[in-house]
Amino acid sequence: MVKLRLKRCGKKQRAVYRIVAIDVRSRREGRDLRKVGFYDPIKNQTYLNIPVILNFLEQGAQPTGTVQDISKKAGFFMDL
């Protein structure tokens, strides 16, 4: 099963996150299938590759709660 979840990047005390499609059995920093977005909580910036995310959702991927909240703030999950 594939999930859309956050992968931590950046420095200590300066975390940024990539939104990735990853196998459920992989750890947080494990090998991802594809990078589908970016989230910076300090600068409050979000980038979502919407066509790729829709493709993974159609194939049965499940977003985690945090990724779903970030997507709602960006206005993406309003229609779904």
Swiss-Prot record:
GO biological process: mitochondrial translation
Expression induction or repression: Transcribed and spliced in green leaves.
Subcellular compartments: Plastid, Chloroplast
Matches recorded under SUPFAM superfamilies: Ribosomal protein S16 (SSF54565)
GO molecular function, one term: structural constituent of ribosome
Domain of life: Eukaryota
GO cellular component: chloroplast; mitochondrion; small ribosomal subunit
Keywords, in A-Z order: Chloroplast, Plastid, Ribonucleoprotein, Ribosomal protein
InterPro entries: Ribosomal_bS16, Ribosomal_bS16_CS, Ribosomal_bS16_dom_sf
HAMAP family noted in UniProt: Ribosomal_bS16 (MF_00385)
Family (UniProt): Belongs to the bacterial ribosomal protein bS16 family.
Official protein name in the record: Small ribosomal subunit protein bS16c
Species of provenance: Lotus japonicus (Lotus corniculatus var. japonicus)
Gene of this entry: rps16
